[in-house]
Amino acid sequence: MPTQTRETTLDELEKLAERGCVYVILDACDAPAVPEKARNLGDELAVSLYNGTAQEDYWAIAPYLCRADTKLLEWVKTSLWKEPWGIVVISTADFAAVRAHFRRFLMVQSPEGEYWYFRFYDPRVLPVFLESSNDNELKEFFGPVQAYAVHSPEDMKLRLIKAV
């Protein structure tokens, strides 16, 4: 199950968003405006991927899953485009299923048995992780996701990554 990458555009993602198939995971660690934006969107459209004490302790730097519409994508473009703000997720699954899927990957275990936060939603991390994953890992990580889109602030390009 290799991956295929191609350039995409915000216009293409906006068309998918109109059909309700686009989510974004916004990384508050590199974009301090994210927690307030998530709060303004409300719990039906935006929620931290963290639960419990992690959510309480790390709300200011947490990843937030948001159902994306054209307004949110435009906000990302105008407010966050020059930062490593997060990733786009294309999925027909409902909000709760997408959140549950990604919560499974927030922590990883090191070879020494320590637990670490896995920042897969960082656009600098996701492509490297996907390229180094085997078929079973890709199948598990894609799950209900049809594709990911990552933005590179360095060259200002948006890339769509699909499992093939």
Question: Which stretches of residues belong to each language-model region?
Answer:
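Terminal low-complexity "docking" segments
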Residues: M1-F118, P123-V164
